[in-house]
Amino acid sequence: MHIAIAGNIGAGKTTLTRLLAKRYGWTPHYEPVDNNPYLEDYYGDMERWSFNLQIYFLNKRFRDVVAIAKSEETVIQDRTIFEDARIFAPNLHDMGLMSDRDFANYTDLFDLMMSLVKLPDLLIYIRSSIPHLIEHIQRRGRDYEQTIRIDYLRGLGERYEEWIKTYQGPMIIVDGDKNDFLDNPADLQRITEMIDERLYGLFPLDNKD
């Protein structure tokens, strides 16, 4: 089974992936950040490195999806291949940071890949406001993220909302501003109840009965 977590930069995808993997005994697949050879250069010069970075992510994510499809384990994935192609690449193109030629090439490659894979069994989308994202980004202190532009985050957020409206697979939406799933066990419990209901048809026990 394939569970995927989606959300803007700083939404808490990696944290929720780790917590749910531990809670359910699922196998986590994390976003390839630490060993990414393009990420630091990209945040220093987005226009120069946007295509290289997006192709790198697309390659890694496609390999992940193929491996997940072959696995007998339940895998929870930190970010999806759809976010790369439906959110990040179009946002860069609209901002003038990816050329028409590169964007067309990238989109053709993604469409070919999508003819070979299926949607996750469940998508968990973390919806977060820009101030909340900025707070998380500053708190985790990755040097290359400190130069992220607010208009870049805002553009991503708008594209996420457009994508979610048209997403065709099973999905739950988590309010990232109101659910502190890292430090508040009750918030994490509420999320797991949503997952149980969607995946297994289970409903939370009513403690008043």
Stretches with model-predicted labels:
Residues 16-17:
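Post-Walker A alpha-helix
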Residues 61-101:
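A basic- and aromatic-enriched beta-loop-alpha substructure that forms the phosphate/nucleotide-
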Residues 86-159:
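A glycine- and Lys/Arg-enriched "phosphate-lid" helix/loop adjacent to the NTP-binding pocket
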Residues 13:
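Conserved lysine of the Walker
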Residues 22-60:
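Conserved substrate/cofactor phosphate-moiety recognition/catalytic segment
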Residues 8:
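P-loop (Walker A) phosphate-binding loop of NTP-binding proteins
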Residues 134-209:
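NTP-dependent small-molecule kinase module
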Residues 5:
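Hydrophobic anchor at the beta1->P-loop junction of P-loop NTPases
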